[in-house]
Amino acid sequence: MLALVRRHKRSKGKSLLDVPCGTGQHLQYIKARFSAEGLDINPKMLAIARKRNPGIKFHRGNMLNFKLPKRFDAITCLFSAIGYMTTTAQLRQAIRNMSLHLTAGGVLIVEPWITPRNFKSGSLHAVLVNKPKLKLARIGRSTAHGRISTINFHYLVATPKTTQYFTESEKFGLFTHSEYLSSLRAAGLKVTYYSKGLIGRGLYVGVKTSQRP
């Protein structure tokens, strides 16, 4: 991913914003090559990110409407986080807002969620952890209603002291390749698309052609 930033970026600086940054795992590696910052809407995630990356500046905000007093040479939106937008209007607004925070020649990298054509309702996913003092199972089941996909997760976690079971549900918008492209171009970005991407979902690289969105 960092190689793509260097390949496409036309600005001279090395500032980078990770949106959303989650617990800051990406930034552990990014910070060695860029002057990195992170943004996330979840205060608990930000607390972990700050502990993991002391010295990095973090901001609390929503990708739809965050406003920072600076522009960046690169903005990354990875792990299909753009899928938290559930309408095309939100998709366009989030991309436009990130583009507004790019300097001219800066690059926006967006890893998309699964497209409507490729999404398989009823698919199952499992993650298992088997350590001496921790046993964990996470089962996910995917469904779709119209252009909204839902993944229902079931967790079973056991330690020497306790066993817990809990669930959570995540909703993601299903957008076509054309909708991603049009949203990026409408935000003033020249787009290159990599079909394989980082984990097989594709990757959009947009270069800011001017200071106007």
Question: Predicted segments — roles?
Answer:
Residues 177-213:
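C-terminal lobe and adjacent flexible extensions of AdoMet/dcAdoMet transferase-like proteins
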Residues 17, 24-65:
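Class I SAM-dependent methyltransferase SAM/SAH-binding core
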Residues 92-104:
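A short glycine-rich, Lys/Arg-flanked "PGG" loop and its adjoining helix->strand segment in the class I
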Residues 12-20:
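Conserved class I S-adenosyl-L-methionine
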Residues 1-12:
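Conserved alpha-helix/loop element of class I SAM-dependent methyltransferases that forms part
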Residues 78-80:
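Residues lining the SAM
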